[in-house]
Amino acid sequence: MMLPKEIMMPNDNPYALHRVKVLKVYSLTETEKLFLFRFEDPELAEKWTFKPGQFVQLTIPGVGEVPISICSSPMRKGFFELCIRKAGRVTTVVHRLKPGDTVLVRGPYGNGFPVDEWEGMDLLLIAAGLGTAPLRSVFLYAMDNRWKYGNITFINTARYGKDLLFYKELEAMKDLAEAENVKIIQSVTRDPNWPGLKGRPQQFIVEANTNPKNTAVAICGPPRMYKSVFEALINYGYRPENIFVTLERRMKCGIGKCGHCNVGTSTSWKYICKDGPVFTYFDIVSTPGLLD
């Protein structure tokens, strides 16, 4: 018996697989590509939604599946974008996809950032490396809903200029962004030939146009950067309860069944895929292993 279509929506059935078509593929760096997908079912495309910070499981039949954070704005119906790094068997096959190819997705999964609770606040986004991708979703959503938020600063960093994700896109937005009290800071940490800004993300917090007492902070990057960024934020007066991070680590099934991403102790533990991937500052400091 066929189930009613509304019951088969991916937001309702966490196990449902849905066919999506590759519309465009952009090479961002030597190892990252940006894929634009569209659901083949037009009704599904209209109903499917997500929150910034959520992820999907991308499936290549006969090869495997991989969890990937959505990096587009949920306001752009019918389409979604994934920034995918070639780092293993599945993602190597994904990087061979061309416009017109089809794959399967399930999701979205995870909690996402509490963007509704942030309305009326300034936003400070701090990204490093591949961490730029999920924060791009937050940034584009905030730009699509500009009237809901105060000043915005996006700090985007990488080790080398060639690895700076979405550099051209963000540079092209700078003039318009500044007119809307949006500040974009892009920096590298190791590139001796880089003509632009150089420095680690925490060094640019002081340049943000945000009010520390009324700012929601979203952070994503390699685990080693969090401690220094946390310390800088607290020193500048940002409230710990308004600091959020998203972690893309150890996830496998996406729904908390396999236990692969379970971290912590018998008294304090989390599933990164189900309880996260977005966590508060207090989650981080109270749950051993979240950043290991």
From Swiss-Prot:
Activity at various pH? Optimum pH is 8.4 for sulfur reductase activity at 80 degrees Celsius.
A Gene Ontology BP annotation from the UniProt entry = pyrimidine nucleotide biosynthetic process
Keywords from UniProt, A to Z, are: 2Fe-2S, Cytoplasm, Electron transport, FAD, Flavoprotein, Iron, Iron-sulfur, Metal-binding, Oxidoreductase, Transport
The positions annotated for binding [2Fe-2S] cluster are 253, 258, 261, 273
Q: Which residues form the FAD-binding FR-type domain?
A: 15-115
Q: How does it assemble?
A: Heterotetramer of alpha, beta, gamma and delta subunits. The nickel-containing alpha and delta subunits constitute the hydrogenase activity. The beta and gamma subunits (flavin-containing dimer) constitute the sulfur reductase activity.
Report the protein's function: Part of a bifunctional enzyme complex that functions as an NADPH-dependent hydrogen-evolving hydrogenase with sulfur reducing activity. May play a role in hydrogen cycling during fermentative growth. Activity not exhibited with NAD. The beta and gamma subunits form the sulfur reducing component that catalyzes the cytoplasmic production of hydrogen sulfide in the presence of elemental sulfur. Not active in the presence of sodium sulfate, sodium sulfite, sodium thiosulfate or cysteine.
The protein's name is Sulfhydrogenase 1 subunit gamma
Originating organism: Pyrococcus furiosus (strain ATCC 43587 / DSM 3638 / JCM 8422 / Vc1)
Query: Gene for this protein?
Result: hydG
